């Protein structure tokens, strides 16, 4: 058998190469991230020690001495830093007024809107942070934040979630002396108001800051995102998704080069400006058909910054810019390394009543595109101590029923029933999301209200509801019909306890719908 002898460093290891031959590399590679600096090697059938320089493994050992061999220099690889969750902090934005989600945001911040029967939107980025190992979490509340603050105050970080030297801090939107009654509600300005937090001594080891929105539905490992940011030595990295033509104008759109660097960014372009942002998304790895269906690259509104870059942008470079998507990112593209990170999984922006409604009902499909049930990456929420749901002679098809409900001889199809909901006999739900209640009424209280001709919390007998969102603590009487048979798209009937948005009837929080009402 032919043999090839070579002198090698004592740290050399036998490793497998792609053609199943064996090779020795001059450094131990197990447990390290190595980055290829570019081989630039030449093919050779012979290799002499005279060619060998310092720190070079002189040969690749093969079974056949006559095969072509490639010499690998040790200097061709260097260690690539691994993302450390302890060096990462996240900022979850509480959002502004939330006009597109009105009336669901009439008394609460967007991240406090209930979703999936027992969660709130804020639980999504919170859980993603926890599951990613990020333990330094700031939540910046800005508008209508009472229910959001109350929800966060009751969070239970048990179940093996250890924060160590980490924390969850709620930074409430406040004014300080010298503000001159200035109003600030946009994302970048809101973060700017709390720059002093990141300059604090206890956060001196934070090298990267993730900016997150509190009104998206997705499951993501943020440390993969941060690792891409580190690998490309980016100043800013923007998470993006392929987007279709119908919704592209609702998002920030970007163009990237072959290295993944963002070379152009436009926030919610319309008309000709929208068409100008079309790209061949096959560069992202999409098939030809997928690239045809999704010709845009849309920002998720999820960013990671080097800490010093973020502070410099907000304080010095762009002190008057108030929004990341429309001002900071487009400006930074010109003179910073701004990279794109493709997130090719389920993601939904819960920005409108229709998108909120559709995303909730999609949870009831089999199989769902998104599922809160995943033992490896669970979703956390505030602690509740509720009994199991009681179901009496009911028919339930493709539905989610939350904790502590009472269902009596009802028919539920393709719907979500939230915590503490009470549905009386003969009730029919189809394509309906009921958020539930904040508290119970006793049987005595219910009987007393009915005796007085009043309506208790829940849904009364023989009521038929379809294509509807029922907000918390709603009181819907008996023999009510909510079908919107006339197909009304928009209506404001706050005095009667409801709105219609995009053809979806929204029963307001704490509203009373009297017996026999037809909507």
UniProtKB/Swiss-Prot annotation:
Enzymatic reactions: alpha-D-glucose 1-phosphate + ATP + H(+) = ADP-alpha-D-glucose + diphosphate
One record GO biological process: glycogen biosynthetic process
Activity regulation summary: Activated by 3'phosphoglycerate, inhibited by orthophosphate. Allosteric regulation.
InterPro entries recorded: ADP-Glc_PPase, ADP_Glu_pyroP_CS, NTP_transferase_dom, Nucleotide-diphossugar_trans, Trimer_LpxA-like_sf
Pathway: Glycan biosynthesis; starch biosynthesis
Compartments where found: Plastid, Chloroplast; Plastid, Amyloplast
Induction, per UniProt: By sucrose.
This protein's GO CC annotations: amyloplast; chloroplast
Top-rank EC class of the record's enzyme: transferase
Tissue: Leaves and tubers.
MF terms in GO: ATP binding; glucose-1-phosphate adenylyltransferase activity
Keywords for this protein: Allosteric enzyme, Amyloplast, ATP-binding, Chloroplast, Nucleotide-binding, Nucleotidyltransferase, Plastid, Starch biosynthesis, Transferase, Transit peptide
Listed Gene3D superfamilies: Hexapeptide repeat proteins, Spore Coat Polysaccharide Biosynthesis Protein SpsA, Chain A
Catalytic activity, EC: 2.7.7.27
Functional description taken from the UniProt entry: This protein plays a role in synthesis of starch. It catalyzes the synthesis of the activated glycosyl donor, ADP-glucose from Glc-1-P and ATP.
Record's subunit section: Heterotetramer.
Family to which the UniProt record says this protein belongs: Belongs to the bacterial/plant glucose-1-phosphate adenylyltransferase family.
Descriptive protein name: Glucose-1-phosphate adenylyltransferase large subunit 2, chloroplastic/amyloplastic
Native source organism of the sequence: Solanum tuberosum
């Amino acid at each position: 058998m032919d043999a090839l002898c070579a002198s090698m460093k004592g740290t050399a290891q036998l490793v497998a190469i792609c053609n199943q031959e064996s090779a020795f590399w001059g450094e131990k590679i197990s447990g390290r991230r190595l980055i290829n600096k570019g081989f630039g090697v030449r093919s050779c059938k012979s290799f002499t020690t005279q060619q060998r320089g310092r720190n070079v493994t002189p040969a690749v050992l093969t079974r056949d001495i006559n095969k072509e061999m490639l010499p690998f220099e040790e200097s061709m690889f260097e260690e690539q830093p691994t993302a450390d969750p302890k060096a990462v902090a996240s900022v979850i934005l509480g959002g502004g007024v939330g006009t597109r989600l009105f009336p669901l945001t009439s008394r609460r911040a967007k991240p406090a809107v209930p979703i999936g029967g027992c969660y709130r939107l804020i639980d999504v980025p919170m859980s993603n942070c926890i599951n990613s190992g990020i333990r330094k979490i700031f939540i910046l509340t800005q508008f209508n934040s009472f229910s959001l603050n109350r929800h966060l105050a009751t969070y239970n970080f048990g179940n093996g979630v250890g924060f160590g030297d980490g924390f969850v801090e709620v930074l409430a939107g406040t004014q300080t002396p010298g503000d001159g009654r200035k109003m600030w509600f946009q994302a970048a300005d809101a973060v700017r108001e709390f720059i002093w937090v990141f300059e604090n001594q206890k956060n001196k080891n934070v090298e990267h800051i993730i900016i997150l929105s509190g009104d998206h539905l997705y499951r993501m490992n943020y440390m993969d995102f941060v690792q891409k940011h580190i690998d490309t030595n980016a100043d800013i990295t923007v998470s993006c998704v392929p987007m279709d033509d119908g919704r592209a104008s609702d998002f920030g759109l970007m163009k990237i080069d072959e290295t993944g660097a963002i070379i152009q960014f436009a926030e919610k372009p319309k008309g000709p400006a929208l068409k100008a942002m079309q790209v061949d998304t096959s560069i992202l790895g999409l098939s030809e058909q997928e690239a045809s269906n999704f010709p845009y690259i849309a920002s998720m509104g999820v960013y990671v910054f080097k800490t010093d870059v973020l502070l410099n942008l907000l304080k010095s470079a762009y002190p008057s810019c108030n929004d990341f998507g429309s001002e900071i990112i487009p400006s930074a593209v010109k003179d910073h390394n701004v990279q794109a990170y493709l997130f090719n999984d389920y993601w939904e922006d819960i920005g409108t009543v229709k998108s909120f409604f559709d995303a909730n009902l999609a949870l009831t499909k089999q199989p769902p595109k998104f599922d809160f049930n995943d033992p490896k990456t669970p979703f956390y929420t505030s602690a509740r101590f509720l009994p199991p749901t009681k179901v009496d002679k009911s028919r339930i098809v493709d539905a989610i029923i939350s904790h502590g409900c009472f269902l009596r001889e009802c028919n539920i199809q393709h719907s979500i029933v939230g915590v503490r909901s009470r549905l009386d006999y003969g009730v029919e739900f189809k394509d309906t999301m009921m958020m539930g209640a904040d508290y119970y009424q006793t049987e005595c209280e219910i009987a007393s209200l009915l005796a007085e001709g009043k309506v208790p919390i829940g849904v009364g007998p023989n009521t038929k509801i379809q294509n509807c969102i029922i907000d918390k603590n709603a009181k819907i009487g008996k023999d009510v019909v909510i079908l919107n048979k006339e197909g009304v798209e928009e209506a404001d009937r706050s005095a009667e306890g409801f709105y219609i948005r995009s053809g979806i009837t929204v029963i307001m929080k704490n509203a009373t719908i009297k017996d026999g009402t037809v909507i």
